């Protein structure tokens, strides 16, 4: 096995026939596989031991040489080398073809590479290859032209007329001859001249041809290598044949395909030897061509070759393609040792960083560690007896296991792993039973519940892996979400309910108004049953201030005292410097879910992760204890139906009948009638809900659950005890008959039927959404996987201006939220000229608030959109790592984090296109399809008309059509835009607009925006639009994640005029490479190229990456590989995927080369000490 770290890049190219023979260990001459009697491989067959190596370790075919001592001997009887049977996985063979055959990838691909090189149409090429027409190879002095096609009849006529003055041929032989004659350099010059002179279709064709010609010149591939004279045979253990129970054999499809090739090849050889008539030989050659096509890519041309049961056989191309192909199934998704899975149950007694591991599972996972320890401690003589002890499960094994697991973290993963919090590390605690115990607080991150979910356990083995698990992945260190930097470990459900109940206060309960000398006394009184937990009491608080004991009486409840014992008392909710408030409890009001989140956020910011983990455990403990003591439960009597409901419904009925009569009298249109009725019922539902919420008691269990944020919502309470309200029909249109009943009263048949529409649509929607969201995440990961923080500072002066995002008058995202954790690109100065933040400094929460208070509306920040790092991004442009709150570390895989942050909430987004009042054009795409539309840079549905010039608007309305005329007075140009029927105008007469402004409502086509307004405008537009979709669903995502993706979408430049560089017109090239090439050209005094930034959708961008391995493992595998082979592409192995594929450490985190090449140098101090010691000893000796 070669050393994995030894190579920097990997190259792909076409193999010459000599190369294929060089790889091969021998020619496969017979189609036989194994002898049915002896079950040994046939000689010269597809499994031949002489070619591929022995089937048994250290044993030749005939059995003359057995045992390791004959290692390397080649048997003189059967010719098999004595070696390991493993070589059957790596030794290749070959088949010498009797006639050349074209490689289907280069014939059929789009565009057909062979066709472009020869300047033949793919149809003509196919006719020649499959022996339908002749092609003229050398016209001699006849009126024929080179590469002209002749039918059988025409060929005969010309042959009679001119005899052998010209040469024509058919099949791959003819094409091979034509390819050999091509002079690439000359052709390249001709094409360049043609590109300069011609226009239109002709020029486009020349550019495409030049691209292929240039690829062959640069890569050193020869065109005739696209025709195969020799076919490689892959090692037999990669296309195995195994015996099934019934004595039958199961074999890989490839063996069938190879067998057909060999059979036809042998038959062709025989026919050629016999000198058979031309027509028979030709037919055999065509069949050989088809057999090789099926082997390489079955089904690409004509009907696929099928096996038993009409199943198409899997060819070499199919082995690579798709989810089950080599790339995605085996290279990117390996199964690993030292892992197990089991059902999870809740473990409320655990600490945040612990998990319960079933004993038998732990024993199996840590088996080698246990065995070594047994030997080390002398409990077993040697490893073998230790193994026996473990397998017999002797009692002393358990004690050793306890010791082994101490300080050895394990990883827990729950599928689907939507973001990096789906795998976290825990310290295992051995538990009885067979279920893994999970801490309740990490459930949110895993999205786990205990209705039968399963989780997988993995053991990190090496010291480095253990250290990374402990420091980076330990659950206690992953308290913040990488998406938005908010805590992910907030208490939920019972815990929230317990804290809510604990901190509530109630009027007129036992013990109200009593005084206590200390908090402890109050708690004792509560425990002895003298006061109620909710009673308002007075408590004397004592504190030492500057060494002097001071005290003050405050009003609170026992519950609040207990709650405050669990949290630090210096969170800044109370001003401790003010003697009036210095003694107050930190939290002296009702605590609900959002308040808990804020408290934890503060604890984290002030005290760091360790303290937060402790606080979390205390809150968990309290929450569970008091929700149990409160004994909150739900019963029908808790659903109190408001008395006003009947009256409100009656009023609504009257209103509706009024609207109906107006409609019948023709005062209002059908549309207005429908809208008014819907509005009436919506208002009524709202009123019923308000009446319900006011009538519910503050300690009503259902109200408490919803109000505390533990479970349920106002909406659900409305359906339980108010009225269900309006429902939508299958098309999404709202049905004007509302459901008047609630669930307590029960629905009647019609109401039940109406509500089934919505329920069914909801389920179908969820199923579709999960798949779509997963696919979106996959594309995002693929486009951004090589974005890694690679340097400290890229040194750019550029940045972007950010301001708050508004939708109409409503602020969607505040300025402060957008600049927290970013680096300022220039000094931020308030009105008095005082600097709030200097250039290149990180903006934190306080500074962001200051900036907003100072009335500054836009701030210039460093951004990923302007980062100048050639590979990856730099620390300054990225800013704060949201999961830690510090400046991002070098080596952080920010691309993948960004993709996960955008993809993970994808399932929560809605699928539907909202239908509002049936106006055409106002149907806007929202939710997941809208995000996809933006990231794929598609032309959106409901397109807005945008102005290409700045100027004054004039609106012309005639009966037939509406026009908007924009006039630019200064440059005296005007443009007229036809407004489609049904669109709403966004501008009015006489309004002054800028180029790129929308004239009608709807979504803008990002490509138009790029042309008119430029790069920055389109980036801002995409960013804001994606944010709008997520914000409407209440999902917070930090801008920088979306910026990473947009950066990747806009990395390429489309070359317009290549100047004197080696680039081709219309080529997509990385912008950094483009600048580099131009710099070289200018230095040599040549004309640089011109180009414009291109906007690619994420699928296109992922396929246009520099790494062919990454692109091939994403989509369109054969197309990517065909292209890469012809261009002789080199994969520099910079991203994560390509390194996973070839099995190297990924270049992120500690795998970055700058960290990997560190070696420890012994400290100088130690050397100094040693020298001093030697001196002392010498002195002592001397004195003696």
Curated annotation (Swiss-Prot):
SMART domains: RPOLA_N. Binds 1 Mg(2+) ion per subunit. Its cofactor is Mg(2+); Zn(2+). InterPro entries: DNA-dir_RpoC_beta_prime, DNA-dir_RpoC_beta_prime_bact, RNA_pol_asu, RNA_pol_N, RNA_pol_Rpb1_1, RNA_pol_Rpb1_3, RNA_pol_Rpb1_3_sf, RNA_pol_Rpb1_4. Keywords: DNA-directed RNA polymerase, Magnesium, Metal-binding, Nucleotidyltransferase, Transcription, Transferase, Zinc. It is an enzyme of class 2 (transferase). It catalyses: RNA(n) + a ribonucleoside 5'-triphosphate = RNA(n+1) + diphosphate. Mg(2+) binds at residues 449, 451, 453. One of its GO terms (cellular component) is DNA-directed RNA polymerase complex. Zn(2+) 1 binds at residues 60, 62, 75, 78. Its EC number is 2.7.7.6. One of its GO terms (molecular function) is magnesium ion binding. GO terms for biological process: DNA-templated transcription. Zn(2+) 2 binds at residues 794, 867, 874, 877. Belongs to the RNA polymerase beta' chain family. The RNAP catalytic core consists of 2 alpha, 1 beta, 1 beta' and 1 omega subunit. When a sigma factor is associated with the core the holoenzyme is formed, which can initiate transcription. NCBIfam families: PRK14906.1, rpoC_TIGR. This is DNA-directed RNA polymerase subunit beta'. The gene is rpoC.
């Amino acid at each position: 096995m070669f050393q994995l770290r030894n190579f920097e890049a990997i190259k792909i190219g076409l193999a010459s026939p000599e190369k294929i023979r060089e790889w091969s260990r021998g020619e496969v001459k017979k189609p036989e596989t194994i002898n049915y009697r002896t079950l040994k491989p046939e000689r010269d067959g597809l499994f031949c031991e002489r070619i591929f190596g022995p089937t048994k370790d250290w044993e030749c075919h005939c059995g003359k040489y057995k045992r390791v001592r004959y290692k390397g001997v080649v048997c003189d009887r059967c010719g098999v080398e004595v070696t390991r049977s493993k070589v059957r996985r790596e030794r290749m063979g070959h088949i010498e073809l009797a006639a050349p055959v074209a490689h289907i990838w280069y014939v059929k691909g789009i565009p057909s590479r062979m066709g472009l090189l020869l300047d033949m149409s793919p149809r003509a090429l196919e006719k020649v290859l499959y022996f339908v027409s002749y092609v003229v190879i050398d016209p001699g002095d006849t009126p024929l032209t080179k590469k002209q096609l002749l039918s059988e009849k025409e060929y005969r006529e010309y042959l009679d007329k001119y005899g052998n003055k010209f040469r024509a041929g058919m099949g791959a032989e003819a094409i091979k001859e034509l390819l050999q004659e091509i002079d690439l350099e000359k052709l390249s010059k001709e094409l360049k001249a043609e590109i300069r002179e011609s226009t239109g279709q002709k020029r486009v064709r020349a550019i495409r041809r030049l691209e292929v010609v240039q690829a062959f010149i640069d890569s050193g591939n020869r065109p005739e290598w696209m025709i195969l004279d020799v076919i490689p045979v892959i090692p037999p253990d990669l296309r195995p044949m195994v015996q099934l129970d019934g004595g039958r054999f199961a074999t890989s499809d490839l063996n069938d395909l190879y067998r057909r090739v060999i059979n036809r090849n042998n038959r062709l050889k025989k026919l050629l030897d016999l000198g058979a008539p031309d027509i028979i030989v030709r037919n055999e050659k065509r069949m050989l061509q088809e057999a090789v096509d099926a082997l390489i890519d079955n089904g690409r041309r004509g009907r696929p070759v099928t096996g038993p049961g009409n199943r198409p056989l899997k060819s070499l191309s199919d082995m690579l393609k798709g989810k089950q192909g080599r790339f995605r199934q085996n290279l990117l998704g390996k199964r690993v040792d030292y892992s197990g899975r089991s059902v999870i149950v809740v473990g409320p007694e655990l600490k945040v960083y612990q998990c319960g591991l079933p004993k038998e599972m732990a024993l199996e996972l840590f088996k080698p560690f246990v065995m070594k320890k047994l030997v080390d401690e002398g409990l077993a003589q040697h490893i073998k007896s230790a193994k026996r002890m473990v397998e017999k499960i002797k009692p002393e094994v358990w004690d050793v296991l306890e010791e082994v697991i101490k300080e050895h973290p394990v990883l827990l993963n729950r599928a689907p792993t939507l973001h990096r919090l789906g795998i976290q590390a825990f310290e295992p605690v051995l538990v009885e039973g067979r279920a893994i115990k999970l801490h309740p607080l990490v459930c949110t991150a895993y999205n786990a519940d205990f209705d039968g979910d399963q989780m997988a356990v993995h053991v990190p083995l090496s010291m480095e892996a253990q250290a990374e698990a402990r420091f980076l992945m330990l659950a206690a260190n992953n308290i913040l979400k990488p998406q938005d930097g908010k805590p992910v470990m907030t208490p939920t459900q019972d815990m929230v309910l317990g804290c809510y109940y604990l901190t509530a206060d109630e009027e007129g309960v036992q013990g109200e108004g009593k005084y206590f000398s200390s908090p402890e006394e109050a708690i004792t009184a509560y425990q002895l049953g003298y006061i109620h937990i909710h009673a308002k009491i007075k408590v004397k608080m004592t504190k030492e201030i500057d060494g002097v004991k001071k005290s003050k009486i405050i009003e609170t409840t026992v519950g609040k005292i207990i709650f405050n014992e669990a949290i630090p008392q210096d969170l800044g909710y109370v001003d401790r410097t003010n003697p009036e408030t210095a003694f107050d409890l930190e939290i002296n009001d009702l605590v609900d879910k959002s308040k808990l989140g804020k408290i934890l956020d503060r604890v984290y910011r002030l005290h760091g992760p360790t303290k937060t983990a402790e606080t979390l455990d205390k809150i968990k403990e309290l929450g569970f204890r008091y929700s149990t003591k409160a004994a909150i439960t739900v019963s029908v009597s808790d659903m109190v139906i408001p008395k006003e409901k009947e009256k409100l419904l009656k009023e609504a009925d009257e209103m509706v009948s009024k609207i109906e009569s107006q409609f019948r009298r023709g005062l209002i249109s059908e549309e207005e009638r429908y809208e008014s009725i819907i509005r009436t019922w919506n208002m009524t539902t709202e009123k019923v809900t308000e009446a319900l919420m006011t009538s519910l008691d503050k300690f009503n269990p259902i109200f408490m659950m919803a109000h505390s944020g533990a479970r349920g919502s106002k909406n659900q309470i409305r359906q339980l005890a108010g009225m269900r309200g309006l429902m939508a029909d299958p098309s999404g249109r709202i049905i004007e008959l509302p459901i008047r009943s609630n669930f307590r009263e029960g629905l009647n048949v019609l109401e039940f039927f109406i509500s089934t529409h919505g329920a069914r649509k909801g389920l179908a929607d969820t199923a579709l959404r999960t798949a779509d969201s997963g696919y979106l995440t996959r594309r995002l990961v693929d486009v951004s996987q090589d974005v890694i923080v690679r340097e400290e500072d890229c040194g750019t002066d550029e940045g972007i201006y950010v301001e708050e995002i508004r939708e109409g008058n409503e602020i969607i995202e505040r300025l402060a939220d957008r600049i927290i954790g970013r680096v300022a690109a220039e000094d931020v100065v308030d009105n008095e000229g005082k600097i709030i933040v200097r250039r290149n400094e990180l903006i934190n929460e306080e500074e962001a608030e200051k900036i907003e208070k100072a009335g500054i509306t836009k701030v210039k920040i460093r951004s990923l959109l302007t980062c100048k790092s050639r590979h990856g991004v730099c620390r300054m442009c990225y800013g704060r790592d949201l999961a830690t709150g510090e400046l991002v570390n070098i080596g952080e895989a920010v691309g993948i984090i960004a993709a996960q942050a955008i993809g993970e909430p994808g399932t929560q987004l809605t699928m539907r296109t909202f239908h509002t009042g049936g106006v055409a054009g106002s149907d806007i795409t929202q939710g997941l399809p809208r995000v996809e539309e933006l990231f794929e840079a598609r032309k959106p549905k409901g397109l807005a008309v945008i102005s290409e010039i700045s100027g004054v608007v004039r609106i012309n309305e005639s009966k037939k059509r509406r026009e908007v005329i924009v006039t630019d007075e200064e440059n005296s140009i005007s443009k007229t835009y036809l407004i489609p029927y049904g669109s709403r105008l966004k501008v009015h007469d006489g309004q002054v607009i800028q180029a790129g402004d929308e004239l009608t409502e709807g979504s803008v086509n990002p490509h138009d925006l790029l042309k008119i307004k430029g790069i920055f405008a389109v980036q801002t537009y995409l960013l804001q639009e994606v944010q709008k979709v997520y914000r409407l669903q209440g999902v917070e995502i930090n801008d920088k994640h979306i910026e990473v993706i947009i950066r990747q979408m806009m990395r390429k430049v489309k070359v317009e005029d290549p100047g004197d560089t080696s680039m081709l017109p219309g080529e997509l090239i990385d912008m950094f490479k483009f600048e580099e090439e131009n710099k070289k050209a200018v230095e040599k005094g040549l004309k640089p190229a011109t180009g414009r930034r291109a906007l690619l959708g994420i699928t296109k961008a992922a396929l246009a990456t520099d790494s062919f391995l990454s692109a091939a493992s994403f989509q369109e595998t054969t197309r990517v590989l065909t292209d890469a082979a012809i261009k002789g592409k080199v994969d520099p192995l910079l991203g994560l995927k390509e390194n996973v594929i070839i099995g190297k450490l990924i270049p992120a985190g500690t795998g970055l080369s700058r960290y990997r090449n560190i070696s420890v140098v012994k400290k100088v101090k130690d050397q100094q000490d040693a020298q001093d010691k030697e001196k002392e000893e010498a002195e002592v000796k001397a004195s003696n």
